[in-house]
Amino acid sequence: MRLLAALCLLPLPLLAEGTQGWYQHNLWVRLDERWSVGNYLDLRLEDGLRETHTWIASPRVRYDVRPDLQLQLNVSFLEAINADETARADWLRLEFEVKPTFRLAEGWTLSFRDRLEWRWRDGGDDFGFRLRVRPQLDWTLRSQGLFRGLYASNEVFYDFDQDRCTENRLIPLGVTLRPGERTELRLFYLWRTTRGATAWQNYHVLGALVSMNY
């Protein structure tokens, strides 16, 4: 009976409030050996891809300190539904990122995106700070062809005003493709957990990230 009960309870952590589809697009233009400018677009759709949950537009500037260390400054304009799924708001974010990369072994790379965000809501006095830390492990299997490798990542959100973690995004498995010389496509499954005022919300996410570099 205990074994049967355990098997019945096993799927409970996998239950989710809904499924989302994310389409993300990165465009970078290199100005010289160190400086690049770009733009990031993000569209997130709710259950059955019927309703827009979030959209983001974000012009960016990147500076390569070394081949294995980048600094980045973003200004993001977005509209999103809150964690409790009760209200929609416009946000303006100023973001500073530190992005180190470590070569672990042949074909294995560990990278981090550490981001500090200053956030304003609806252009008013609602202002706050948030920290996001995302380690990512890439496994490169091929240097040519469409399929290039696999990756996994986990991102933690910490809100300084609430003094607690408010979101987690786990990608247990993603696929890296190279459809063109300057284009990379990442397809992923993401388990998203957000913390509202009274409870955690969970979502299954299927996503695609297109990156173009010139």
Mark where each language-model region is.
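Hydrophobic h-region of N-terminal signal peptides that target proteins for export
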Residues: L7-A16
